[in-house]
């Protein structure tokens, strides 16, 4: 019998009548049907505080006269002095094999409440260290997927669309947040123009999401340039190794959205996994 898998769904939408809430409900149903244990962090329902502050640390601060949140929160994590709400969320993350982030795209990024969740929960020492980041990060054995709704149509987020390439929009979240902490990032579930989508199509989208979730653990993650391609020290500047740079000179495309090397970006690098 396969080992029990655990999923954590982080929902960032205020309304239970929203399509985002319906996507969350569909995910819970589909995963539980396949034997997953599912936890949900409904950030609005929880009244989650997205603002980083001194209140996140219990006990004496290391340097109260020159408060620096990253250093103080990392030390507080190490010494078990983080506030209870942060500890609760970190425990959920620790226990999960798969994280699903369900949210509407707002101003080309995550909603403020979810941004605050990342800033408060993904503390130094817990979610990253500079000695262990990206594919060597603390969460390298976990998987994550973004399930996003947009107001604009798919064409608006295309290469010729007025909003620009969706791959560019996804890079800071998928690489700069999730993969930076080690997650294997799966193809995003993108639901475009949901406000203009008729009920029958919405039903089809929910059914397709449920179907995908049946085997989501077996999916191939998105490609990111491995950390082994870089000189990982401050003296070298964490730059691409010279021999790798030389190897890439004759390639038509760059390595990824962020590591394009001045060349065309690989098609759908942040939307489709390499086959």
From Swiss-Prot:
Protein residues bound to FAD: 13, 19-20, 68, 105-108, 149-152, 157, 202
Modification Phosphoserine, positions: 83
Subcellular location: Cytoplasm, Cytosol
Any one Gene Ontology molecular-function term assigned to this protein's record: NADH:ubiquinone reductase (non-electrogenic) activity
Crosslink position(s): Glycyl lysine isopeptide (Lys-Gly) (interchain with G-Cter in SUMO2): 252
Binding positions for substrate per the UniProt entry: 127-129
Catalytic activity line of the entry: a quinone + NADH + H(+) = a quinol + NAD(+); a quinone + NADPH + H(+) = a quinol + NADP(+); ubiquinone-10 + NADH + H(+) = ubiquinol-10 + NAD(+); menadione + NADH + H(+) = menadiol + NAD(+)
Enzyme Commission number(s) of this protein: 1.6.5.2
Keyword Transferase: no
Pfam families, sorted: Flavodoxin_2
A single GO cellular-component term on record: cytosol
Region (Important for apoenzyme conformational stability): 226-275
Entries under SUPFAM superfamilies matching the protein: Flavoproteins
Cofactor: FAD
Top EC class of this enzyme: oxidoreductase
Highest taxon listed in the record's lineage: Eukaryota
GO biological process, any: vitamin E metabolic process
Record's keyword terms, sorted: Cytoplasm, FAD, Flavoprotein, Isopeptide bond, NAD, NADP, Oxidoreductase, Phosphoprotein, Ubl conjugation
Role according to the record: Flavin-containing quinone reductase that catalyzes two-electron reduction of quinones to hydroquinones using either NADH or NADPH as electron donors. In a ping-pong kinetic mechanism, the electrons are sequentially transferred from NAD(P)H to flavin cofactor and then from reduced flavin to the quinone, bypassing the formation of semiquinone and reactive oxygen species. Regulates cellular redox state primarily through quinone detoxification. Reduces components of plasma membrane redox system such as coenzyme Q and vitamin quinones, producing antioxidant hydroquinone forms.
Subunit structure: Homodimer. Interacts with PDLIM4 isoform 2; this interaction stabilizes PDLIM4 isoform 2 in response to oxidative stress and protects it from ubiquitin-independent degradation by the core 20S proteasome. Interacts with TP73 (via SAM domain); this interaction is NADH-dependent, stabilizes TP73 in response to oxidative stress and protects it from ubiquitin-independent degradation by the 20S proteasome. Interacts with TP53; this interaction is NADH-dependent, stabilizes TP53 in response to oxidative stress and protects it from ubiquitin-independent degradation by the 20S proteasome.
Family: Belongs to the NAD(P)H dehydrogenase (quinone) family.
Protein name (record): NAD(P)H dehydrogenase [quinone] 1
Organism from which the protein derives: Cavia porcellus (Guinea pig)
């Amino acid at each position: 019998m396969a080992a029990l898998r655990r999923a954590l769904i982080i929902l960032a939408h205020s309304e239970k009548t929203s399509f985002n809430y319906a996507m969350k409900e569909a995910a819970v149903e589909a995963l539980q049907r396949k034997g997953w244990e599912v936890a949900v962090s409904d950030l609005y329902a929880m009244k989650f505080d997205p603002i980083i502050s001194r209140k996140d640390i219990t006990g004496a601060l290391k340097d109260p006269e020159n408060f620096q949140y990253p250093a103080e929160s990392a030390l507080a994590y190490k010494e078990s002095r983080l506030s209870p709400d942060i500890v609760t969320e970190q425990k959920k993350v620790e226990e999960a094999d798969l994280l699903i982030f369900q949210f509407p795209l707002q101003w080309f990024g995550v909603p403020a409440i979810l941004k605050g969740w990342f800033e408060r929960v993904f503390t130094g020492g817990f979610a990253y260290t500079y000695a262990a980041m990206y594919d060597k990060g603390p969460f390298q054995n976990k998987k994550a997927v973004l399930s996003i709704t947009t107001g604009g149509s798919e064409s608006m987020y295309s290469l010729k669309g007025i909003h620009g390439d969706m791959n560019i929009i996804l890079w800071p979240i998928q690489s700069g947040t999730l993969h930076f902490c080690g997650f294997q990032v799966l193809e995003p579930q993108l639901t475009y123009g949901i406000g203009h989508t008729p009920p029958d199509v919405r039903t089809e989208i929910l059914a397709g999401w449920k179907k995908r979730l049946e085997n989501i653990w077996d999916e191939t993650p998105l490609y990111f340039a491995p950390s082994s391609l870089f000189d990982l020290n401050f003296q070298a500047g964490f730059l691409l190794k010279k021999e790798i740079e030389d190897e890439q000179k004759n390639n038509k495309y760059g390595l990824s959205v962020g590591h394009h090397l001045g060349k065309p970006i690989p098609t759908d690098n942040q939307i489709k996994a390499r086959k």
